[in-house]
Amino acid sequence: MPLRNVMAENNFKMLKIQQCVANKLPRNRPYICNICFKHFETPSKLARHYLIHTGQKPFECDVCHKNFRQLVHLERHQLTHNLPFSCNICQRHFKNLKTFVKHQQLHNESYHNDVKVRRLLETKQEKPVYGMCNTFTADERWALHPCSKSDATYSTTKRRKNIHACTICGKMFPSQSKLDRHSLIHTGQRPFKCVLCSKSFRQSTHLKIHQLTHSEERPFQCCFCQKGFKIQSKLLKHKQIHTRNKTLQNLPLKVKSPESCPLPNKLNAKQDAFESGDMGESEENNPLDVHSIYIVPFQCSECEECFESEQILNGHKCLPARGGRVPSRLKRSCNYKTIVKKLLAKLKRAGGKKSDDLQSEKKRTFKSNYLKNCERSSGKPNIEQTQRTFVGSLSRHGSYKTVSKKKKKTLALPFSWQKQFQSQNTGKSLQGILTTGSILSMDGSVNNKDLSIYGSSGEEYLNCDMLQCGFSDSSENIHTGHKMCPCDKCDKVFPSISKLQRHYLIHTGQRPFDCNVCGKSFRQSAHLKRHKLTHIEKIPYSSFWRVDFGNVNQLFIHPSDDVSYNASQQCEGLGSQSCESSESSQVSEIEVKVEPEDFLLGSHCRSRQSYLANALVESEQSHHCYSYLGRPERSDGLLYQCSVCCKHFRSPSKLERHYLIHAGQKPFECSVCGKTFRQAPHWKRHQLTHFKERPQEKVVLDSTV
């Protein structure tokens, strides 16, 4: 069939499909793929779809030897090798006549000038009509739209008439294909498998992303720092670092005195380190350098709280009814510690000298329970009570070291808390500088000799004798910045309801996740998955054995009698295997039987059975046979139990070697001195002693023993 007829037939089929879509005629798709559950109209399309899962590309190009999954793709590719239209000026080839004619017109100068003039006239005519506005506002869109704003009957679900719901979890999906893809989560199927590492994935896109890990190619490159990435999403996330650096340079800088500085000394000390590169300068000698410049990212004019972005600042509202408190939904954004940490990271990325003293100069800001107690109390708060509640949070933090013993360390409290201290008429104007020369130990104890809080006037606000009591348990969660969910039974606090519900399982004793292998139950699914790995590691030792002696007393009567073995193996399906032994003296006959477990594969059982039969027949270490029974209850890796002393071993070879102790046999004999040994390594190590005594003689090691 000529190529033009094939293309015409394919175009006719596509036109027919487009007409069906335009008329919204239902299409019958009775053929379903059993791997990804897609529907198809004909069995030929289903067979063509199976090539995706198998990875076959049967159609090969004769010119460049490229493979394609469909014949149409091959025919379209062959057109690239046959370009009938060639340009005489630039020697370019084209496969389409229309594109070739357009290309020829580009070489014509008159045509090129006519196009420029025409485009210039079109732009001049459009300017007075539309002006500079290229888009409509929201009100203009409603004016142009036939529906009114108050039309309550209009619903977005009219555009999606066919909404498919999952019968298991009740989720809604706009198409059947997405519902089928979602059903793979409940069935646990992962049809797309990696050829290199045998990992399986639920979607083909996930497999393609995973396959990039096996290759060293990084096609997506950053235009700023020339760093390469394998995924485009990681490149876009990386570019945000460069954009943040540009926006950081545009932040306003203000100069304030130490009395009105709202940011802690941590940020100012870090910024001075970037500018000067010297952390050794004393803060007491020049305090203005510490508070000279600070960055105001997005600050509220009323309560002087700092926020990460302008959007969070616009959502922040300081109302008198709230008493200056931040709403609960914005608590995370107002976490002072995280804001300072992010600003320091931005300063470090923006440029500056890196110093080891920066890491040693890490300081932490501590929140107090003072505001909470002040809100509950109606009158003037007790000074002694506020002193106890404020300092108690210091004992709940970890180790805190100073840079040197000579210098004191200062910690600044947030300005909003300082303002609250001043508004309570306590008689002191607290600047909020915590000076300490001591070290807080890991157990939370505080050395109170050099620990005190000073106000802006330099007078001592809280002395050493006041720092002895602690907060209540509820105050420990004020500075976390998360939504707290307390447990009503044990008074534990959790950041989310899901973690609280998981904690309730401890009080109820429920363990909803059961192991289908050993029957153990777990409280979390992660613990169950981690436990299942222990069963996967035991698959090489797929059969569980136990050895029983017929008569233990007869083991020690004739230790030197010869034993002849007759092994017979039955390999029908998962059948049993027997190994009979006959001895010259009166020893009870013993049989070896294997009973495979249900959860293990038959191939592993058969390979283990054949291996054990050959090991028993070929080795003459043991003169007695044993019977093996399944013992799946052990989960510590010791699967093979001795019936005499009840010891457990990890492999049958170690168990056989152990039985030589009960039998009193030492099959390895030294040909020089006549000593016998239970193991071959012991015998070889003994042979070296004779070699050292007689270095000139050659000791021949019999490898057949």
From Swiss-Prot:
Return the PROSITE patterns for the record: ZINC_FINGER_C2H2_1, ZINC_FINGER_C2H2_2
Q: What is its main location?
A: nucleus
Q: Do you know which Gene3D superfamilies this protein is assigned to?
A: Classic Zinc Finger
Q: Where is this cross-link: Glycyl lysine isopeptide (Lys-Gly) (interchain with G-Cter in SUMO2)?
A: K16, K116, K124, K149, K266, K698
Looking at the UniProt entry, the stretches that span the membrane are none
C2H2-type ZnF: 31-53, 59-81, 85-107, 164-186, 192-214, 220-242, 298-322, 485-507, 513-535, 640-662, 668-690
Entry GO terms, CC: nucleus
User: Which subcellular locations apply to this protein?
Assistant: Nucleus
Q: Which UniProt keywords apply?
A: DNA-binding, Isopeptide bond, Metal-binding, Nucleus, Repeat, Transcription, Transcription regulation, Ubl conjugation, Zinc, Zinc-finger
Alphabetized Pfam families for the sequence = zf-C2H2 (PF00096)
* Gene Ontology MF terms: DNA binding; zinc ion binding
Say which domain of life the source belongs to: Eukaryota
- Similarity annotation: Belongs to the krueppel C2H2-type zinc-finger protein family.
The task this protein performs is described as: May be involved in transcriptional regulation.
Q: What is this protein called?
A: Zinc finger protein 770
Tell me the lineage of the source organism. Answer: Eukaryota, Metazoa, Chordata, Craniata, Vertebrata
Q: Which gene encodes it?
A: Znf770
